[in-house]
Regions:
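A glycine-rich beta-to-alpha transition motif near the start of alpha/beta enzyme domains, typified by
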Residues: 1-111, 151-195
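Active-site glycine-rich loop that binds ribose-phosphate moieties when present
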Residues: 120-139
């Protein structure tokens, strides 16, 4: 039997397991994918195993929904912080969470929200074939915030079928390890919509 918790942050949902005892078999990627499957499992965007760390309050061992290892996830690390505080009954206002992309500092805001310092964006990454590519008639630029993202600016998000374009970009041969995809519409100089 597996005891798990379901958390969500800004539209992403996660299965979280207390794995400080290291009993969850991380080698079984099929099991991870099945847990995250929305039709045959619990359903989630990813699996977070909360583990002990000698460098931080805890380690976020993160897996994508298909069972592959990921460096981290910004929304996931905020959920991991909330889970850690509830699990340990801690009243800390700042946490350090170790990830494969380094240690992240999470601030517990008043009102129950969490902020994370993601660090400076990285514009060259082993998963980027070049600085930009035109795919599906959209120019995508690449940035890593601990994991790779393809960001494409469009005139109107309403004219784009993200459920069609997203998987084509994510699984494009240029990205053998896959890539996160965001489409951005500029509303004003200070306001952007993102899908």
């Amino acid at each position: 039997m597996i005891t798990f918790y379901k958390y969500h942050g800004a539209g992403n949902d996660f299965i979280i397991i207390d794995n400080r005892d290291k009993k969850f078999d991380v080698q079984n990627t099929k099991k991870i994918a099945l847990l995250c499957d929305r039709h045959f499992g619990v359903g989630a965007d990813g699996l977070i195993l909360l583990e002990s760390s000698d460098k931080a309050d805890c380690f976020m061992n993160y897996y994508n929904a298909d069972g592959t290892i990921a460096e981290m996830c910004g929304n996931g690390v905020r959920c991991a912080a909330k889970f850690f505080l509830e699990l340990t009954k801690s009243s800390k206002k700042e946490l350090l969470i170790d990830t494969r992309a380094g240690i992240k500092k999470i601030i517990c805001n008043s009102g129950g929200s969490f902020s994370v310092n993601m660090g400076a964006p990285i514009f060259s990454h082993k998963d980027f074939p070049k600085n930009s590519l035109v795919l599906e008639n959209i120019e995508f630029n690449f940035v890593s915030m601990g994991n790779p993202h393809a960001v494409g600016f469009v005139k109107s998000l309403n004219d784009i079928d993200i459920s069609n374009i997203g998987p084509k970009i994510e699984n494009n041969f240029h990205f053998p390890n896959k890539i996160n995809v965001e489409l951005v519409e500029k509303v004003s100089d200070t306001h952007f919509k993102v899908k």
